[in-house]
């Protein structure tokens, strides 16, 4: 059972009715004792106040029993609350994935005839095509710039190393390598830390949250895209243990969000197209297509992109959306393939389907037998354990960063330090290695000879002195004997910790390729070891085990199964290994989940995001809507005084975003629910002065169209920017035409799983709780549901924090 220690009201505090309460109704039963799950009596209840600041010294409201009786009210005393995963942030708002079916919406829908409906559908397909084209072009730009900048850097360093190997003074080569890496990473980190912090990392957790219904500030803005693309180029060229494939998912999502709106709010340009799609519901579907197009461009895997969007991203799905997402993915792959083929001088040879090409695995030369399946499962176990270790280390590292490295300047210094350490460690390992291999048959672009004989190269450099994508291909396809076990073991150990340290830096970067590279290294080592131990012919090609190890390691870290299986199959152009890859990924996920969550889910929790999973906690049937709902609720009347509305919207302590509308009755009679209206709608109504004087109630207030609301979307002005005179405060606003007259409601006795299923499946933002007389008694929001989760000790309730 849950240890429910706090009950946090929707408004963040309990308030008595103030003057003017007859016009502004606060419903609910704050004086009634709410049963506790642990059986504690009324005396054990704590205050509703539970507002904290994470990682900062700020004013907080503490529970009454925690206060020193000799001190003044808590507002004057700061307290730092250590950040942990058992906090839920109040700063995140929900997106409106349920259309408000008010009179304006219904009138517009009724006016749409069959021809207009077909036009809207055609526009959806056109937008998906544009998403695919632009995502593919962005991927081409990233790939070409990285190839040229990284090539220039490695050529300069190689020439310097070759020069000083003969005459001595390789320390200067080390200094040059570390300086170049740090310089690139410095620029990449500065633009992220100081201009757009949301562009840090791969962006996959943020896009998952957006598609789940959480409004992440700036996550799909044009500025974020520019910083993301620039940052990932500089991170990869800077030699960090990162990849450019993960951020393509975020980039595709931003492109989709921008194209589908037909305007740029950042550039203040409105092209007057696609106005019908200016709402969260439509934008969500296009962002799903953008995420899939990003995967498709990264790996040349259009089907894998669709499945990734389904498995990891989209919370809401339908058949027509599947077709459009697949179409966008195919267009993205083709665009990338076509442009890169032209760039490489083979205009009609479409041989570059993705940013990374794993190369073709020959089924005849690398066939597997039934006896190898247990070996593959064992590799999945290893991948799950190593993935759990990776995630656990990254968890503690992220906690340290949240507490101590939260200033932008410190974040930039850390990124530069990691870049310098990565270059230093790579140089030392290459310098110390005596693993020399013949140049003939090598796939190295920049072979380093160092102390090897003429015609040979240092094999440790094949892993370190290259972009991560090329290193993965080298481990997959270099012939047997290209690496000795000591080289692979050292590389795996060192790169594992470097990748773990790198993920979470304030740079734009992904974890896909580093995970594949780590897994390919220990997988190849695994195959070599089996060959030594058994001497059997079936163990002959270590590239096969490098592929399985790569899948196991990536699956153990991110815990994807279905989509990753198809991505690996499409990227290798080989269906033969579909079954063993699936076994490896499933085993890695099962083993990893025993110890810790996947990397993306872990970082979502660390950011205290109110993320709703597919199902409610399995042990939550004992909870009802009455126990989880927020009370008291601020309600408005059908015809409300403008001054009351302005005061409600200006209340920064509550920051309400949805208001039940009740019937106009006397103060002595209970008010029944009539509808629901959003803060954003009220803002637009106030901006356009949609009200009349109380003395002239017979006048008709100004009419608005849906276009007026869409023009204000998505950056609705704050209430502070709207001037309302004292005379206007006495006017009256009729909400009947703008409220949603049929909001979803549940009775107080509804179980939490039932409430959760309704809220989650319909993409709701507010769910009204009513009694037997249809009177509002509470409101269920995303945070009310997200704060209950299944912990190691059973059902637990998270604390709400103002981060």
From Swiss-Prot:
Reaction it catalyzes: 2 chloride(in) + H(+)(out) = 2 chloride(out) + H(+)(in)
Subcellular location: Lysosome membrane
Membrane topology (Cytoplasmic): 1-124, 596-803
SUPFAM superfamilies found in the cross-reference section: CBS-domain pair, Clc chloride channel
GO cellular component, one term: chloride channel complex
Residues the record lists as binding ATP: 656-658, 781-784
Pfam families: CBS, Voltage_CLC
Residues annotated as binding chloride: 202, 512, 600
Tissue: Liver, spleen, kidneys and brain.
Span list, region Disordered: 1-46
Residues where Phosphoserine is found: 9, 799
Protein's organism: Mus musculus
Quaternary data: Chloride channel 7 are heteromers of alpha (CLCN7) and beta (OSTM1) subunits.
TM spans (from-to): 125-157, 172-195, 221-239, 245-262, 320-339, 373-403, 408-430, 485-505, 510-533, 577-595
Protein name from the UniProt record: H(+)/Cl(-) exchange transporter 7
Residues the record marks as site: Mediates proton transfer from the protein to the inner aqueous phase: 312
Positions marked as site (Mediates proton transfer from the outer aqueous phase to the interior of the protein): 245
Segments carrying motif Selectivity filter part_2: 243-247
Effect of deleting the gene: Accumulates undegraded endocyted material in neurons or renal proximal tubular cells. Almost all ClC-7-deficient neurons die.
